[in-house]
Each structure stands twice: as structure tokens, then as C-alpha cells.
Design a protein with these regions (language model features):
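Short Lys/Arg-enriched alpha/beta "domain-start" segment
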Residues: 1-28
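Short, compositionally biased low-complexity segments
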Residues: 1-2, 87-108, 175-183, 278-314, ...
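Signature of N6-adenine DNA methyltransferases within the class I
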Residues: 33-37, 43-95, 99, 109-140, ...
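Generic amphipathic alpha-helical segments used as scaffolds and interaction surfaces in large
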Residues: 111-123, 144-152, 156, 192-196, ...
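Long recognition/docking surfaces used for binding and targeting
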Residues: 235-376
């Protein structure tokens, strides 16, 4: 780099997306041979865009334009504190404190390091992690149904953060008033007496969560948002109604506060903000489980001190025991002081465009790291391991791309090897982030869109939803390239409903039930039309993909909530407030309880092996459960949701009784009846996709299964009884997920995992190696060896992609060994350039050696000439 060129561009519009600005920046940069930094101006905002360039690998005289990095929407007045800090850090004076700047090359490197999103993410995670471990010592959540106080407070605090971070993103979009997070303005809203009290959390946050975001706006439903009525004659007319405001005495002017600060916030739905305090009836006796503690009773034990949110003073605390350090000082400050120091973006960064701001993907990382502070598999705390196992973005992107290519290539027509290779190249171009047009003909486009609509993906250990989000965003991008105006995608959704109507006419004999159901389906066509007409193209793509294609299981209910959070944010990003319209033109969030379930995915409840006996019962159940789930997904009215929940519970009870009559094991039938998918606190002790989703199999299973050593598996005896062919008493937990994936897949379905690589060579991996060699078609095996994918972990890893299909005798698969010293930014290029092939039949059961034929021949010669260690005395 010998020089820089700066350009300023004044745009006419008021609002530009990151992608729009990135595309403009790329087009302008194409015209110049030297780096160009562009300053966009529009509507009193400024965006700075820098395009990363690298030398073309084939033509060294040309550059390839890669990622566009932006400091976006800098206000020219009342500039965000985080933007001021970023711009100050880019000054020559500030750069010179850390770097020697004596050329454009060194200046470029210093700027790149300063704008590195990874460094920003690390800084934020460090601050939030410190805050979390400071707060955990100060909060008290009600006992609920969790006896362990440490676990209860950990989960309660993570749940609080989940809700609050979503609210913060809403604030960034202008949907919630800044005043509710401003310590100075809050003194005029609520009564603060002592920073150790919980006035802020109770009066502002709980009323915001449960009585505002979970309640329709007053202008749409009169008197919906109000304080609960006074208790008279020991009668509480609004007892246990958690959608009404509480803590009236904490406000200076309660008669005004709703209209001034809460009335114009849109209703969200979606379950994220439902109060978890519940009433249960057992033997005609009512009792109450308090989890959120949304109550102004004097005996409410809930405590979340105000200083955790509002303190602006940095203080030193001792976290050495938690982090496994010695004599180190850690700094903490109030949560809002931390959040105000960073800029947030609701759009997830991609490999080709990123904003210097915190995006939802980072939040997945943060929450998954915090979840690691309590391990439900081992029932032990492992706080110093926090941050070990979150799958890096580049690994997620790679696994997502390869899974989609493996799925879609089998959907496209081809008759020769050359045609298949040609289709694969076209698919890679389709998935690659580029402004080049795709190369598929109209017939192939229709096939691809139909295949995407039929796609079923599950992550059986979804954690914070990294893979599900990665798949969602990549499929949205594919649909954008194949069908830029959503014409075909819209028609696909309407065709789906028309098929259901046709099936309903044939299968339902009761005329009234039939016509009622058909009318509901016709209404849903109108809803589809409205969605596509009124909302952003990407919103319509995401909504129907989430409904039809995306499924997740995790043993931690709070992990399911975090996955929901990320999916919800992805829908929020494509919506904008419209004054005067119902709910400000914001479409309420869907209900995801029927797509994301808390369960032990490794413990099956088998129906399939008795299908000949129960076939009719099961088919009838699947038909009804799918209809319930379709209706529930988009239901917004609380009364309607309660009605659907009750009807589904009745269906499961009837299904359970039918199974019992047919000699199905009584305890398993009871498990089906007792399972409640709508309770965000419960964990199903079993997993069965038919019962939970109305599905028998999936096209893609993708996961980063939990890393739990065999001696710490709490339910090893259940695994032994669950019929796993690969069971070994010394196997680590992740190995069972391989066989689980195989069972969940349809024929030719794809499994893509990243796990420890011990199974490739260890004795406990023998059965797994044999199982995969005999029953699957390996496609890709990547051995990372000493290369640390998980930066704060010492686990050596591998990625494997296989098809559920018997391998032909000459079947070849791709493999690569990653050197330990490879730089992370060079990983994707290394994978592309260094893949080799190996015959699957040459893999030996006692150890898988990933090497080309020359190495394998040498290994064979050595083994023939030598004497195995086990044969020595």
C-alpha cells in the first residue's frame, strides 16, 4: 500500500442498510487500484466504509475486494459515546501510543487492528463477564422449582440479561424510550431510597417485560396496559394476572407513568417476556411457583440491587477464585454504563460486511459462555472454563455451507459426474457472498426453492443457536439471489396452504370441523399475502423458514430461550415503526415453543419399532399435532394461546391413553402425557421428533455437542439402556450424538459435527469408527490436531460431514489435516487448497489415519517390518 484515497459521498435518502452501503463501497472501489475509504453522508448521519483488499491468487496484478468494514450511522449531533471513542482511537496520536506508524502499510495495519471486531467483542465479553460474577453475589431470585440456590440465581440472572439485551436492541431501533435507561431521568420517574434496593428492576424492568411487551398497546386494546386494581375486603380481583402493572408505590406519578413512558412501546408476544410465576393444581390443591417474582407483596424475596444497573462508578472486586487466577484485580461498573460504552447493531455481521458494533452473534457467544458456568450434564460448576466451547463464526459458516451444498446437490438433476461437479460449482457461487448473478436456469431455481421450503434442520444440542442462526441467514441470502422479489417464495407458501386445504377436504369427515379448519387455512393465506406485501423481503423469508425448517433441542431451558432471542432479533431487524398503524406497524413475534424444545436429546422414546401396531394412532396424532403447531406459531391473543395449549394437552393425554391400550409401556405413555412444551422451566426426560414436532426425520443434523467426559455423565445407565450400537462405558458424551444424528436423518440426509477428535484414534471410539465406516458415506473429515479452534480450551477437534447412505466399495471422501500454527484468517483458504481424497474402505477400525496413499503405504511397510508395542514383554 503506497497511498490511500479518501472520498466523500452525499446520499439523497434518509436511511440506508449496511448491505446497501457495502455494495456502493465495493462498486466505487472496483474503479481504483489503491485502497479507498469512503465517507457517506445522509440525514445528519455519517458512515465510514473501509474495504479489505487482498492480492488475487491467480493474477498478482489485480486485487480481490473482500470484507467491507463500517462505522455506521454516526450522528453529527449528540454523537454516541462509543462512536467518539472509536474515532479517537483511529487518530494518529492515539495509534502512535501502540504502533510505529512510518508508512501507509503500517497505518493500514494499525487501523485494521483498531477496527478488529474480535477485539471489540473480547473487551465487551470481559466487562459483561465481570459484571455477571459480581451480580451473582448480590441477586436473590425466588425458589421456584430449583432447590440449588447457586443454579437458581445463575439461571435467573442469565434470563434477566437475555430479556434486557433484547430490550436494548429495541431501544437502539427507537422502539423504547431512552429515559428508561438514563440514571438521571429515572430519578424523576421512580423513588430511589437505597442503591441496595430493587426499585429499578421491579418498577421499570419487570413492568416493561411482563406488563408492556407482553400486553397489547392501549390504542389497540383499550385499558390493556394499566395497574392492577386495589385489594378490597381481602379480595384481589387481579390476582395472578401477570400482564398488569405492579409496584405503584415506587413511582412518583403512577397516574401518568404508563402514558408517558410505556404506552407507545409495541407489543411483542413470542414468549420471551411471559412471566414464569405459575399456578399449579395437584389433588385439587392450588399452589404457586414463583420464578420471576413479579409481585408487590411484602414477603417477595426478589432482590436485584439498583447499583447493578445504574452505578457509573468503576470499582475493584475479587474474582480470582472464579477465574482461577491469583492476586489479580478486576473492575466492574453498572450494566448501563457498560452497554452505553458500545454501539449495538441488530444486523448480524457476515464474512463480507461488518459494522464496528456488537451484533446478536456476539450475544450468543456471551450467553453460551455464561451458561458454561453451570454444567447440567455433570451437575457441577466450572466457572473458570467459561468461554471454552463457543463455535467460532468462521467454523459455523464453513459447516453451514458444506451442509447446504451436500443437501442441495442431491436435489438437482444430473446424469453424469461432470454435471454433478458443474452443479456443485454453481452452488458454491450461489452461497458465496458476491454481487455476481447465480448460474441456474429457471427450472433449477424452482427446484432449489422447493427444496429449501421442504428442508428440515435440527441442532440436537443447540446452545445459543449459532448453527441455526447461521443456516437461517445463509438460506435467506440464497433466496435473495434466487428470487430477489420474493415472487416464487410467496407462491410456495400459498401453494403449501392450498395443499393442506385439499388434504383437509379428503381426510376430515365431520363437515363442521372440516369447514372451520378450511376457513382458518384460507385466513392464513390472507395473512401470507399481508406479510409479503407489508414487510421487508428478508422478514418474509425468515418468518417462514423459522416456521417450517428450523428445529432445536437443548438440555438447558435457558439455552432454548437464548436461541429464541437470536431468532427474534433477526425478525426485529427487518421491521421499522410506522406511526398511526396498529402496534406501530411492528408484527408481533411468533411462538417458537413448538420448534425449540428443552429435552435430553440422547434419551429416545421409541415409537418406530412398533409402527406396525400403532401406525394409525401415530399418523392421526402427527396430523393433529402439525395443525395445532401451525395455528399456535402465529397466534398472538393470550386467550387463544391458552385455548390451544389446553387442546394440545388434551390431544397428548388421548394419545397416551391410546398407546396404553395398545400395550405401549405405561411409564413412557405417562411421560408423553406429562410433557409440557409450553413450560419454559421443564425439561423433557426424553426426545422423540414425532411427539414433539410431528416429524419422523430431518435432512440436516448439525451440532457442536457438549464436551463431557465419561466419568462425569450423570445418566450413563440410561444411555446403556437406550439401544446405542456404539455404547461404551468409557465413551465421552459427544460420541452418542453421532449415532443420534444417524437415527434422526432421512435417507441421504446430512450430518455435520464438530467434536473432540479423540474418537478417531482412541479405544473408546472403535465402535463409532466401525459404525460410521459401515453405515455412512463420509464426505469430509477435517482433523485440527493441535490447532485450537476453541481459543480458551485445550480440546483438539475435528469436523465431520457424512451422508446417511451405505458406501460403495470405491467411495472416496475428502480429508485435510490442519497445522497447529495456521493463522485463523487463513483457515478457509487452507481448507480449499489442501483437501485430499481417501477411499473409505481403507480406514482401519483400530485407528483412522488421514493421509494420502504414499503415507499409508509407508505406514503399512513400517507395521509389517516392526513389532507392535502390545506384543513386547
Amino acid at each position: 500500500i503506497k497511498s490511500y484515497l479518501f472520498a466523500s459521498l452525499k446520499l439523497k435518502g434518509d436511511k440506508y442498510t449496511r448491505t446497501q452501503l457495502a455494495n456502493i463501497a465495493r462498486q466505487i472501489n472496483k474503479q481504483y487500484a489503491i485502497p479507498l475509504i469512503i465517507l457517506f453522508q445522509y440525514n445528519n448521519l455519517v458512515t465510514i466504509a473501509v474495504v479489505t483488499r487482498r492480492q488475487n491468487l491467480k493474477d498478482t496484478q489485480r486485487d480481490v475486494l473482500e470484507k467491507v468494514t463500517m462505522i455506521k450511522d454516526i450522528k453529527t449531533t449528540d454523537t454516541h459515546r462509543a462512536h467518539i471513542d472509536i474515532l479517537a482511537d483511529l487518530s494518529l496520536e492515539k495509534l502512535s501510543e501502540h504502533y510505529i506508524i512510518n508508512s501507509f502499510e503500517t497505518l493500514h495495519n494499525a487501523w485494521s487492528a483498531t477496527l478488529d471486531i474480535n477485539e471489540l467483542n473480547k473487551r465487551f465479553y470481559k466487562e459483561l463477564s465481570n459484571w455477571y460474577f459480581w451480580a451473582i453475589k448480590k441477586v436473590v431470585f425466588p425458589a421456584g422449582d430449583e432447590e440449588n440456590e447457586e443454579v437458581r440465581n445463575s439461571i435467573g440472572l442469565i434470563r434477566l440479561l437475555t430479556r434486557l439485551i433484547f430490550v436494548w436492541f429495541m431501544k437502539e431501533k427507537g422502539l423504547i424510550p431512552d429515559a428508561l435507561f438514563d440514571p438521571q431521568k429515572l430519578t424523576n420517574i421512580i423513588k430511589f431510597e437505597d442503591f441496595n434496593d430493587s426499585a429499578y428492576y421491579k418498577a421499570i424492568l419487570q413492568n416493561l417485560f411482563f406488563a408492556t411487551l407482553n400486553t397489547e398497546m392501549n390504542k389497540d386494546k383499550e385499558n390493556s396496559r394499566r395497574f392492577r386494581r386495589k385489594i378490597k375486603s381481602n379480595m384481589n380481583p387481579d390476582f395472578n394476572v401477570h400482564t398488569l402493572f405492579r409496584y405503584e408505590s415506587l413511582f412518583h406519578h403512577p397516574e401518568q407513568v404508563i402514558d408517558e413512558y410505556f404506552a407507545d412501546i409495541p407489543f411483542l408476544n413470542g414468549g420471551l417476556f411471559e412471566c414464569l410465576d405459575t399456578e399449579i393444581t395437584n389433588n385439587n390443591q392450588k399452589s404457586y411457583i414463583r420464578i420471576d417474582g413479579f409481585s408487590d407483596r411484602p414477603d417477595n424475596v426478589l432482590k436485584v440491587p439498583d447499583e447493578l444497573f445504574l452505578s457509573g462508578i468503576e470499582q475493584n472486586i475479587d474474582l480470582n477464585e472464579i477465574y482461577g487466577t491469583q492476586n489479580k484485580s478486576y473492575q466492574v461498573r453498572g450494566l448501563f454504563s457498560i452497554l452505553n460504552s458500545y454501539k449495538f447493531t441488530v444486523a448480524e455481521n457476515t464474512p463480507i460486511e461488518e459494522e464496528v458494533a456488537l451484533d446478536p452473534e456476539l450475544l450468543g457467544c456471551v450467553f453460551e459462555n455464561l451458561l458454561a458456568s453451570y454444567n447440567p450434564e455433570t451437575k457441577t460448576t466450572a466457572r473458570h472454563e467459561t468461554g471454552s466451547f463457543y463455535t467460532p463464526r468462521e467454523i459455523v459458516d464453513y459447516m453451514v455451507d458444506e451442509s447446504l451444498i451436500a443437501y442441495l446437490i442431491n436435489e438437482l438433476p444430473y446424469s453424469t459426474k461432470e454435471e454433478k461437479e458443474d452443479s456443485e460449482l454453481k452452488l458454491r457461487l450461489l452461497l458465496y457472498y458476491t454481487d455476481e448473478d447465480h448460474l441456474f436456469n429457471p427450472e433449477e431455481v424452482d427446484i432449489l426453492i422447493n427444496s429449501i421450503d421442504n428442508l428440515k434442520v435440527i441442532d440436537p444440542a443447540c446452545g445459543s443457536g449459532a448453527f441455526l442462526m447461521g443456516l437461517l441467514l445463509k438460506i435467506v441470502y440464497i433466496l435473495h439471489k434466487l428470487d430477489p422479489h420474493n415472487t416464487k417464495w410467496k407462491q410456495q407458501q400459498i401453494d403449501n396452504i392450498n395443499k393442506l386445504i385439499a388434504d383437509m377436504r379428503q381426510s376430515v369427515t365431520d363437515p363442521k370441523v372440516r369447514e372451520d379448519n378450511i376457513q382458518k387455512l384460507k385466513d392464513s393465506i390472507q395473512d401470507i399475502e399481508q406479510t409479503f406485501d407489508e414487510f421487508d423481503f428478508d422478514y418474509s423469508r425468515k418468518l417462514f423458514l423459522i416456521e417450517h425448517c428450523i428445529y432445536g433441542i437443548d438440555i438447558q431451558p435457558i439455552a432454548i430461550q437464548i436461541t429464541k432471542l437470536r431468532l427474534f432479533i433477526s425478525l426485529l431487524v427487518d421491521q421499522y415503526p410506522k406511526q398511526g398503524e396498529p402496534n406501530l406497524g411492528i408484527r408481533a413475534l411468533p411462538n417458537l415453543e413448538t420448534n425449540l424444545v428443552a429435552a435430553n436429546s440422547l434419551i429416545p422414546l421409541e415409537l418406530e419399532n412398533q409402527m406396525d401396531i400403532f401406525n394409525t394412532i401415530i399418523e392421526n396424532y402427527i396430523s393433529k399435532i402439525k395443525a395445532f403447531h401451525k395455528e399456535y406459531f402465529s397466534t398472538r391473543n393470550r386467550k387463544d394461546k391458552l385455548d390451544l395449549k389446553a387442546r394440545e394437552h388434551k390431544l397428548r393425554m388421548e394419545f397416551s391413553e391410546e398407546l396404553k391400550k395398545s400395550a405401549f409401556p405405561a411409564q413412557e405413555a405417562e411421560d408423553i402425557a406429562n410433557w409440557d412444551p409450553y413450560s419454559v422451566n421443564s425439561i423433557a426426560p426424553f426426545f422423540n421428533p414425532t411427539i414433539m414436532f410431528g416429524l419422523t426425520n430431518f435432512n440436516i443434523v448439525i451440532a457442536n455437542p457438549p464436551y463431557v467426559r465419561q466419568e462425569n455423565i450423570a445418566y450413563k445407565d440410561l444411555l446403556d439402556k437406550s439401544g446405542y450400537q456404539i455404547f461404551n462405558s468409557t465413551s465421552d458424551l459427544y460420541t452418542y450424538f453421532y449415532e443420534l444424528a444417524y437415527k434422526l436423518l432421512s435417507e441421504n440426509g446430512i450430518a455435520t459435527f464438530i467434536t473432540s477428535n479423540k474418537w478417531l484414534r482412541s479405544k473408546y471410539g472403535t465402535k463409532l469408527r466401525q459404525f460410521l465406516k459401515q453405515n455412512t458415506k463420509l464426505q469430509i473429515v477435517i482433523d485440527f490436531g493441535g490447532y485450537q479452534v476453541f481459543k480458551s480450551s485445550t480440546v483438539d477437534t475435528n469436523i465431520i460431514l457424512f451422508l446417511k447412505a451405505k458406501p460403495e466399495p470405491q467411495h472416496l471422501f475428502n480429508f485435510v489435516n490442519i497445522p497447529a500454527d495456521l493463522k485463523p484468517e487463513n483457515l478457509s483458504q487452507f481448507l480449499y487448497n489442501n483437501m485430499q481424497t481417501l477411499q473409505q474402505k481403507t480406514l482401519e477400525v483400530n485407528c483412522w489415519t488421514l493421509a494420502d496413499n504414499s503415507i499409508l503405504n509407508l505406514k503399512t511397510k513400517i507395521e509389517k517390518a516392526g513389532k507392535p508395542l502390545k506384543d513386547w514383554d
